[in-house]
Amino acid sequence: MSYNTFGHIFRVTTWGESHGPALGATVDGCPPGVAIEAEAIQHWLDRRKPGQNRFTTQRQEPDAVRILSGTFEGRSTGTPIQLMIENTDQRSKDYGEIARSFRPGHADIAYHWKYGLRDYRGGGRSSARETAARVAAGGVARAALAALVPGLRIEGYMVQIGPHAIDRARFDADEIERNPFWCPDSDTAALWADYLDGLRKAHDSVGAIVEVRASGVPAGLGAPIYGKLDSDLAAAMMTINAVKGVEIGEGMAAACLTGSANADEIRMGPEGPEFLTNHAGGILGGISTGQDVVVRFAVKPTSSILTPRRSVTTDGCEVEVVTKGRHDPCVGIRAVPVGEAMMACVLLDHLLLDRGQTGGLRGTIG
């Protein structure tokens, strides 16, 4: 199996399976001298780990990260950083009944067609368990960004679960860390809680939309045509399990706007040009403008549910499949820190690319 690595200069290779002994990431291209401690990476992993509330899978994994290489006396050496997370709460017996059946909505049948075999225990490599390694790598990227661009901030939050979207007029950033949904609207968070409780009782699941915003991003990251910042961000978000669509800025809604409404006007401010709006999501022509970079991605409903569904076996027999085990009623909840991690990795990669190409040179206005 190839294609386990992403990035250009800051490169991340993830490895491991859901029910294997461990999983992790090899991070290459981190600049030397960056302060990197396991405790700091653990902070980001703790935001993603399962079993923290009734709205996520009850699999109990501490997700304790170990740094095996690439640091000395708490700082990066410039050599590959190896991160490892042990799996401690696998229940492979939960999947014995589907060893020869394909779960509808899962990668099972596609893996079987491509490779001729598959790890049926929790999806193996296709499990969202793999994203723990991405969050660990994102912790390294955040540390490097903090050293190189001190004012840069990345924050993700849920904006919709099922048909229920937040009220943007009630957006409160302080609310994001106060509820299990990373929701910036307390009223909607309460609605989501009742909604998900009902779905859990009905043995069903639902999709969601996550928004990730990066502020303090320097202007000039990205490149025209094939090196666009937004194309790399979209590709990164699409690699997250269950993601089925990505928007930058106004996204699909831009198709409903007129040119006069969508184009972000510019005026001269005390410190230079200022945009009056941000429909572009902080990126024009594939290059960052200095405004907030705004990305949204849609996550499909969890495919593992207790409702019987029709499928087939490896022998070609028709069967009904009930997916046992411990699963999230809405995988979008734990996708929030994963989206943040992917944003961090892509921004650091483009920052290093830009420094290599332009040396930080910038055009001036005024």
UniProtKB/Swiss-Prot annotation:
<keyword id="KW-0521">NADP</keyword>
<keyword id="KW-0057">Aromatic amino acid biosynthesis</keyword>
<dbReference type="GO" id="GO:0009423">
    <property type="term" value="P:chorismate biosynthetic process"/>
</dbReference>
<feature type="binding site">
    <location>
        <position position="54"/>
    </location>
    <ligand>
        <name>NADP(+)</name>
    </ligand>
</feature>
<dbReference type="GO" id="GO:0005829">
    <property type="term" value="C:cytosol"/>
</dbReference>
<feature type="binding site">
    <location>
        <begin position="300"/>
        <end position="304"/>
    </location>
    <ligand>
        <name>FMN</name>
    </ligand>
</feature>
<dbReference type="GO" id="GO:0008652">
    <property type="term" value="P:amino acid biosynthetic process"/>
</dbReference>
<keyword id="KW-0028">Amino-acid biosynthesis</keyword>
<comment type="similarity">
    <text>Belongs to the chorismate synthase family.</text>
</comment>
<keyword id="KW-0288">FMN</keyword>
<feature type="binding site">
    <location>
        <begin position="125"/>
        <end position="127"/>
    </location>
    <ligand>
        <name>FMN</name>
    </ligand>
</feature>
<feature type="binding site">
    <location>
        <begin position="241"/>
        <end position="242"/>
    </location>
    <ligand>
        <name>FMN</name>
    </ligand>
</feature>
<dbReference type="GO" id="GO:0009073">
    <property type="term" value="P:aromatic amino acid family biosynthetic process"/>
</dbReference>
<feature type="binding site">
    <location>
        <position position="326"/>
    </location>
    <ligand>
        <name>FMN</name>
    </ligand>
</feature>
<dbReference type="InterPro" id="IPR035904">
    <property type="entry name" value="Chorismate_synth_AroC_sf"/>
</dbReference>
<dbReference type="GO" id="GO:0004107">
    <property type="term" value="F:chorismate synthase activity"/>
</dbReference>
<keyword id="KW-0274">FAD</keyword>
<feature type="binding site">
    <location>
        <position position="48"/>
    </location>
    <ligand>
        <name>NADP(+)</name>
    </ligand>
</feature>
<protein>
    <recommendedName>
        <fullName>Chorismate synthase</fullName>
        <ecNumber>4.2.3.5</ecNumber>
    </recommendedName>
</protein>
<keyword id="KW-0285">Flavoprotein</keyword>
<comment type="function">
    <text>This reaction introduces a second double bond into the aromatic ring system.</text>
</comment>
<dbReference type="InterPro" id="IPR020541">
    <property type="entry name" value="Chorismate_synthase_CS"/>
</dbReference>
<comment type="pathway">
    <text>Metabolic intermediate biosynthesis; chorismate biosynthesis; chorismate from D-erythrose 4-phosphate and phosphoenolpyruvate: step 7/7.</text>
</comment>
<dbReference type="Pfam" id="PF01264">
    <property type="entry name" value="Chorismate_synt"/>
</dbReference>
<feature type="binding site">
    <location>
        <position position="285"/>
    </location>
    <ligand>
        <name>FMN</name>
    </ligand>
</feature>
<keyword id="KW-0456">Lyase</keyword>
<dbReference type="GO" id="GO:0010181">
    <property type="term" value="F:FMN binding"/>
</dbReference>
<dbReference type="InterPro" id="IPR000453">
    <property type="entry name" value="Chorismate_synth"/>
</dbReference>
<comment type="subunit">
    <text>Homotetramer.</text>
</comment>
